[in-house]
Amino acid sequence: LYGIFQAKNAIRKEDFCFLVEGYTDVISLHQAGIENAVASSGTALTEDQIKLIRRFTENVTVLFDGDAAGIRAALRGIDLILKGGLNVRVLLLPDGEDPDSYSRKHSTNTLTDYFKKNAKDFISFKIDLYAAE
């Protein structure tokens, strides 16, 4: 789980963590002042990674790319996180953006405002997704 050592105090303080896809996403978010982010390091999320997150919080916001691959990864992650007994929210970025590119373009305040306004509980996320199909 990439970045957990650097993020653990912020995760405890904020009582949630952002789960992103890759290490560049974690680095860019940390540089933008969003320090409670970790990555599954480009691999599929594992039960052991979820147990590690659970040591610091029971709340996870899945922050993946807004493209089709990001949505598929978010769906896989949601089910595994729920199975691990954690609370899940989902935040998709605009199409063509990932946490790395988005955090480079926007200030910390803009990022946190966007994240707060657009994070959805997993049920709303799935309903919106299936309604769009």
Q: What is each PLM-predicted segment?
A:
Residues T24-D25, T43-L45, D67-A69, P94-D98:
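Conserved nucleotide-binding/hydrolysis micro-motifs of P-loop NTPases
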Residues G33-A37, G77-L80, K105-T108:
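Short secondary-structure boundary/capping segments
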Residues L45, Q49, A68-K83:
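Glycine-rich phosphate-binding loops that contact phosphosugars or nucleotide phosphates
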Residues I50-I53, D79-I81, K116-F122:
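Flexible glycine/proline-rich, aromatic-decorated loop/lid segments
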Residues R55-E58, L82, L86:
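Hydrophobic alpha-helix feature that most strongly marks membrane-spanning transmembrane helices
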